[in-house]
Amino acid sequence: MSKYWNDKVREIEPYVPGEQPKDRKYIKLNTNENPYPPSDKVLEAMRNAVNGDLKLYPDPTCSELTSEIANYYKLDENEIFIGNGSDEILAFSFMTFFSKNKKILFPDISYTFYKVYAELFDLNYELVKLDDNFDIPLEELKKTNGGVIIPNPNAPTGKYINTESLKSLIEANKDRVVIIDEAYIDFGGQSMVKYMHEYDNLLVIQTLSKSRSLAGLRVGFALGHKDLIEGLNRIKNSINSYTIDRVALAGAKAAIQDSKYFEEITKKIVKTREKVVKELEKLDFRVLKSESNFVFASHNNASGKFIYENLKCQGILVRYFDKERIDNFLRITIGTNEEMDILIEKLRFILSNNQKEL
């Protein structure tokens, strides 16, 4: 702590990312990264972008990438906003659409950056408690508020809300912005993008980090009514006009174009997920229904902390949350088939031997 910090810095509780230890080689199943690399076309596009033009600033409008996304979703370019990862877009959205005198609503067990941003920007907020099945109680999100944000599928639970239920939520909040954070939508759910033109209060946020294997580039995008997008651009251009570098723009554009590779790896991950769920259930885990690239599971006898610590000793990282209601759960990213086979093997060993120190 420094004497030069202002009160906000002293008070804020920052987001804590998944651990990335360097002490040994781990199988990383803790940060929901894609286990497969970007496509060859993406890597080639990025290599080609490493040239003398790096002396120049990148395109502040991200026009080529915007055009590619517009073609992909059949939208107008003024309905698309590009950001430095979906986290940046979420931060801009909190600044753009939510006011200090109106309470915003989001689930109590979801992406913890929502709470961080609300407190960082001094916003009034209410955490809506998930029900006993870890479902988001949508009726609670329909009461008077200053805006709503929910992840779909939810993280860390992986549970998905159908489009009809979300349409009802949006209709109940016609005078307020409803943000649907679709970071994991490509692994089983239906995007709300197709309903965008029905609702001028709907903002959909997606990322290239998960299904497009580009977590290292930090590129995300928002889709919504042109007036919402204009608001985001006003905030962006009041902070940093050049949020995406040239290499990232080239790689992201190629990733959107290479839909064949995208479809292949997402299907592969979903297939692996289905297999892993069955194997975990055989080991006496309770696994929540997931439409994401991870599963949320608790064991009927062993604690989440015990399993997490022993897996780490065995060279496997999973995400453990030391929080009320979910402290016995583990969030396990779906890796390659080979990685998940090793996970199941190690779990079988840990549980059968009741090892506390390995």
Curated annotation (Swiss-Prot):
Domain of life: Bacteria
Protein EC: 2.6.1.9
Keywords: Amino-acid biosynthesis, Aminotransferase, Histidine biosynthesis, Pyridoxal phosphate, Transferase
Record bears the keyword Protease: no
One example of a Gene Ontology biological process annotation: L-histidine biosynthetic process
Pfam families on file: Aminotran_1_2
Protein name per its UniProtKB record: Histidinol-phosphate aminotransferase
Organism: Clostridium beijerinckii (strain ATCC 51743 / NCIMB 8052)
Gene: hisC
